[in-house]
Every structure is written in structure tokens, then in C-alpha cells.
């Protein structure tokens, strides 16, 4: 089992970053940390998408990683996509320092995120509470600013 993974985020604009993942036990939580720069100040949706395909930019990554066919939600919700990591918060300089621990994603097994795409979005994720159909699919997080395929790390 891989215990570490990394993702280099890039987009068409100024947004870029490096996100690290570490899972010490196969059924334990995954620590997610790193930094994203070039964002507007505020909240930005942060999700693992189904495919590791960036051939047409971030759009070819498909929908959120959702092997259990659930509705979109927040990272602490029972009803959520596996890939729903909530929001990252950018400061006035456009930098989001990421520090998350998640017990639904994994670096092995059915919820493995390796080979899938991590995406940072234009807007805040409403965590499935926006009151419309799009909220239950995407959290109304808007366009995909930057993305990268999650790969095994040393």
C-alpha cells in the first residue's frame, strides 16, 4: 500500500500549488496538507474528481469521485461524495494553506484517490446545502481553477 501521495495543481491562470497526502494505516485517516497560491481571497471548493484525465484541462477530470452514488455534502457529513473535501481558505495575498484530515478518502482500496484528479474551484462549496439540484452534485463551487493528478510519492 502506498502511504504517501502528492498532487501538483496547475491551471490556465495564476492558480498553482502542491498538496501532499499521507496515510499511516490502511483504514486510518489521510492527512492532506500543502499550499495553493494565486486564488482570490475567501473560500474555494476542494474536491477529488473521478478521473485522472487532464487532456482537456480540468474539465476532463469528470464529476466528483463518488463510488457510493451519494449526494454532495461537506467533509463531516454522512451523506457526501468520497471526493468531497470541503473548502480551502485563501488569505488576502491569495494563498491557501491547506491542513485537512479526512477519514473517507484513502490511498488504497475502494476509496483510493491515487490516479484521480484534485481540483480547486472558483467559488465556495455550499456543502450540499444550497437548496438546488446543482448543490447536491457540485456544491455550486463554480469553474475549475486548477487541477492535477494525484500520484504515489516516496
From Swiss-Prot:
The modification N-acetylalanine is found at residue 2. GO terms for cellular component: axon cytoplasm; cytoplasm; cytoplasmic vesicle; cytosol; dendrite cytoplasm; dense core granule; extracellular exosome; extracellular region. It catalyses: 2 superoxide + 2 H(+) = H2O2 + O2. Changing residue 91 to A: In ALS1; does not seem to be linked with a decrease in activity. Its EC number is 1.15.1.1. Its cofactor is Cu cation; Zn(2+). Changing residue 81 to A: Loss of zinc binding and enhanced tendency to form aggregates. The modification N6-succinyllysine is found at residues 4, 10, 92, 123, 137. Changing residue 94 to A: In ALS1; increases tendency to form fibrillar aggregates; ubiquitinated by RNF19A; ubiquitinated by MARCHF5. It is linked to Amyotrophic lateral sclerosis 1: A neurodegenerative disorder affecting upper motor neurons in the brain and lower motor neurons in the brain stem and spinal cord, resulting in fatal paralysis. Sensory abnormalities are absent. The pathologic hallmarks of the disease include pallor of the corticospinal tract due to loss of motor neurons, presence of ubiquitin-positive inclusions within surviving motor neurons, and deposition of pathologic aggregates. The etiology of amyotrophic lateral sclerosis is likely to be multifactorial, involving both genetic and environmental factors. Spastic tetraplegia and axial hypotonia, progressive: An autosomal recessive, neurologic disorder characterized by loss of motor abilities in the first year of life, after which severe, progressive spastic tetraparesis develops. Affected individuals have severe axial hypotonia, hyperekplexia, hypertonia, and myokymia, reflecting upper motor neuron involvement. Cognitive development may be affected. The protein (both wild-type and ALS1 variants) has a tendency to form fibrillar aggregates in the absence of the intramolecular disulfide bond or of bound zinc ions. These aggregates may have cytotoxic effects. Zinc binding promotes dimerization and stabilizes the native form. This is Superoxide dismutase [Cu-Zn]. It comes from Homo sapiens. The gene is SOD1.
